[in-house]
Amino acid sequence: MAPREEPVFSLVAYREAMHIVIAGGHGKIALLLSRLLADAGHRPTGLIRDPDQAADLRSAGAEPVVLDLEKSTREEIASALTGADAVVFAAGSGPDSGPERKLTVDRDGAVLLAEAAVSAGVRRFVVVSSIGADEYDPSSSDGMQIYLKAKSEADAAVRALDLDWTIVRPGGLTNDEPTGLVTVAERSDRSSISRADVAAVFAAVLEADQTIGKQFEVVGGSTPIGEALTNLGGASQAE
């Protein structure tokens, strides 16, 4: 019989099981993250707009909660976060959205969720941002530039709040198989990373207190995820 193939990345729970709420719970990264967290004994909850997506979340090990960030108040969102140990912002307007929605979802949605976390007393807050977010052209009406502007402004707002935040800025996303190997840096080259590896980075970040108060870019590389995050411990906090 052939030996059992070990997973590329396995999350080991170093603390008690956590309840983690993921906004944008039906996104590809969010579903992959939910499965990793559930397999490690944590309790993921996914916030979704469409109740028809609930079955997909349950299949990934997450409990679905129908809540639209664009139509909900801070108090309503805070109610959904109450009792959680951590919150992940993984929502996105999508590549086909117009400029206005990039601002209302990618910027305003992230800020509203972060403010709701403060109201709910949830200190740990982790953001799916974007590589090069601070390098946008403020005079451009191009969709990508507006997206980067939205991410940059959201990240700045999160950093200003009284939260134990971590902001992760992945490179170009692919659907490749995971490698478990990354490059983590304050600034990295503009290469790509698989969504599966991004999900694994977020799962590890939620276990890694040394990432609190850190903002970094991550792309595919040659360093195991856990080691890359450990090495991040000496990096300076983002301004």
What are the language-model segments listed below?
Residues M18-H42:
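N-terminal Rossmann NAD(P)H-binding glycine-rich loop of SDR-like oxidoreductase domains
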Residues V21, T45, V65, V126, ...:
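Conserved beta-strand positions in the Rossmann-like core of class I SAM-dependent methyltransferases
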Residues I29, V87, V168, V198-F202, ...:
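Non-catalytic, hydrophobic alpha-helical segments
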Residues G46-L112, A116-S119, E207-Q210:
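NAD(P)H-binding glycine-rich loop region in Rossmannoid oxidoreductase-like domains
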Residues S93-A185:
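Glycine-/Pro-rich loop/turn segments that contact NAD(P) or position catalytic residues
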Residues A150, D189-A204, K214:
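Substrate-positioning beta->alpha
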Residues E177-G180, V205-K214:
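Glycine/proline-rich active-site loop of Rossmann-fold NAD(P)-dependent oxidoreductases
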Residues Q215-T223:
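Short-chain dehydrogenase/reductase
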